[in-house]
């Protein structure tokens, strides 16, 4: 998603761009064998199906949750070996208004305190020492797909050239000037593409971007990143675990307390996170608590959800079919409408099971790493070899969050609205980490920083070791905090595009594709 946005921004500055996509014009459902990796410990769950190749990449499959990192997430946290970001909070969020407009998000605040237009009559606690409540925004289905958003602006743009089914397989580097001269791409069917440019941007997701950087180093005989101790290291992901079941005691107040809020079509949801003070006291990383429910268990809500999806997809035949076979319960439908129109919340029926989960930031560790393995993919390229596993500090973060949340829930009197039945693995002596899985938010292996030995890119996403290469994505995160990464990725894309555009002085002359090159599928 970041690469398409950078391309759009550069064309707006009169710069010619070539977009090279490893996947097809649209991501194909199911697993892509090019995403397969070698996993030394067998711990990582989502390397194949948790990411998508194709125009728009993983933006075609993500849920749409957008929330900033907290100011504390960007600071040095020596108790978990997390370095400071090379950007202050205000610097990082300079492009926030533009990114929110791109996804058609409202301009309301994310910070603690329910937005004033919600008339719920029930408020989550504020000012607690252990937990703060922020408010995430959700992109609608049609506005979460980056290719859907930008296709009209890029597909026929005179300065944009787009190639699909073109996987980078070789780099040509001038080792003396440390400049990238060209890339060579293959599609596995005998077609090849060579691109020369003044500046290159790598925005292929954490796993693939890191693999390509390691391949670039190999093409440079191991000399390009020889002085860098960070490339491929500090692989991390959010870890998510079920911790309890909610027992609703006051249904009316429950859905007005925890249900998603709406303003028009804009969805907001509470993001309950461990405070910086609690983290320092316990010497643990960030974490947040969230509720999940399968609303399709309720016939009325399941029908409404399917109808809404058909409508957003402009699938009017499917919409008609759903209407013909639907059976909407008048009472549930009436409460749903009343909740949305008056309280601006989603009606949460009593026949749906609600689960409590904790999602933690994994502490960065040098030994968790990506390297090029001996196994090859169908294009003959080395697969990612991952050495990664959770650590003791991750278990402590889970346990600290669970223990403090239990006390918080009772201290604030929320157990009178709904109780919590804690699962067995949350008890003393058990392991929460063993019940957890990665959250498909990989990051950290090309981290930002000011020291070229300890980081791969600087605060403008420019590679310390290759003069004309930018890397954009969660791979550049020094730490992941307790926020979904998509908003931060897009803010970094905004920053990188601005820096590149400022540095480029010769418009419409920066990309050269040799005439002899052949593309597999030119969009």
List the model feature ranges, each with a label.
Residues 12, 25-26, 48, 171, ...:
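Glycine-rich loop(s) and the adjacent beta-strand/alpha-helix scaffold that form part
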Residues 163-176, 339-369, 379, 383-478, ...:
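A glycine-rich dinucleotide-binding beta-alpha-beta segment and adjacent secondary-structure elements
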Residues 28-31, 58, 64, 73-77, ...:
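Short, solvent-exposed loop/turn and secondary-structure capping segments
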Residues 36-112, 363-374, 378:
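Redox-cofactor-proximal catalytic regions of oxidoreductases
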Residues 103, 228-231, 240, 244-382, ...:
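FAD cofactor-binding and catalytic pocket of flavoenzymes
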Residues 78-180, 426, 430-438:
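Conserved redox-cofactor binding core of oxidoreductases
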Residues 1-19:
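N-terminal Rossmann-like FAD-binding beta1-loop-alpha1 element of flavoenzymes
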């Amino acid at each position: 998603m970041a690469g398409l946005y950078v391309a759009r921004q550069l064309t707006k500055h009169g710069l010619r761009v070539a977009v090279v996509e490893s996947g097809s014009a649209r991501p194909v459902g199911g697993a892509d064998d090019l995403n397969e990796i070698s996993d030394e410990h067998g711990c990582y769950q989502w390397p194949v199906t948790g990411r998508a190749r194709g125009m728009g990449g993983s933006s075609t499959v993500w849920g749409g949750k957008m929330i900033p990192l907290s100011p504390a997430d960007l600071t040095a946290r020596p108790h978990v070996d997390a370095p400071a970001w090379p950007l202050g909070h205000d610097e990082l969020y300079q492009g926030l208004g533009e990114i929110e407009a791109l996804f058609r998000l409202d301009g309301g605040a994310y910070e603690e305190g329910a937005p004033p237009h919600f008339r719920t009559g029930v408020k989550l606690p504020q000012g607690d020492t252990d937990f703060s409540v922020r408010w995430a925004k959700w992109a609608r289905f049609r506005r979460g797909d980056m290719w859907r958003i930008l296709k009209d602006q890029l597909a026929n743009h005179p300065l944009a050239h787009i190639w699909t089914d073109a996987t980078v397989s070789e780099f040509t580097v001038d080792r003396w000037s440390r400049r990238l001269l060209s890339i060579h791409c293959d599609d596995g069917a005998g077609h090849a593409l060579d691109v020369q440019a003044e500046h290159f941007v790598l925005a292929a997701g954490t796993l693939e971007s890191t693999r390509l950087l390691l391949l670039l180093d190999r093409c440079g005989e191991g000399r390009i990143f020889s002085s860098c101790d960070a490339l491929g290291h500090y692989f991390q992901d959010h870890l998510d675990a079920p911790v309890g079941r909610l027992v609703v005691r006051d249904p009316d107040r429950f859905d007005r307390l925890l249900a998603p809020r709406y303003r028009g079509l804009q969805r907001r949801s509470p993001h309950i996170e461990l405070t910086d003070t609690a983290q320092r006291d316990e010497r643990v990383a960030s974490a947040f608590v969230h509720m999940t429910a399968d609303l399709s268990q309720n016939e009325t809500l399941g029908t409404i959800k399917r109808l809404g999806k058909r409508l957003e997809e402009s699938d009017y035949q499917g919409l008609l079919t759903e209407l013909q076979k639907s059976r909407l319960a008048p009472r549930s439908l009436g409460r749903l409408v009343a909740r949305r129109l008056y309280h601006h919340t989603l009606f949460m029926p009593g026949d749906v099971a609600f689960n409590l989960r904790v999602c933690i930031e994994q502490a960065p560790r040098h030994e968790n790493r990506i390297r090029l393995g001996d196994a090859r993919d169908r294009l003959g390229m080395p697969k990612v070899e991952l050495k990664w596993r959770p650590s003791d500090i991750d278990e402590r973060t889970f346990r600290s969050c669970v223990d403090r949340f239990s006390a918080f829930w009772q201290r604030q009197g929320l157990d009178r609205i709904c109780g919590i039945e804690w699962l067995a693995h949350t008890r003393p002596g058990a392991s929460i980490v063993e019940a957890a899985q990665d959250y498909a938010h990989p990051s950290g292996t090309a981290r930002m920083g000011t020291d070229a030995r300890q980081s791969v890119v600087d605060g403008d996403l420019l590679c310390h070791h290759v003069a004309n290469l930018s890397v954009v994505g969660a791979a550049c995160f020094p730490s992941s905090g307790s926020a979904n990464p998509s908003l931060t990725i897009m803010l970094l894309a905004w920053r990188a595009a601005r820096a590149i555009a400022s540095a480029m002085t010769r418009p419409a002359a920066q990309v050269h594709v040799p005439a002899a090159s052949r593309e597999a599928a030119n969009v």
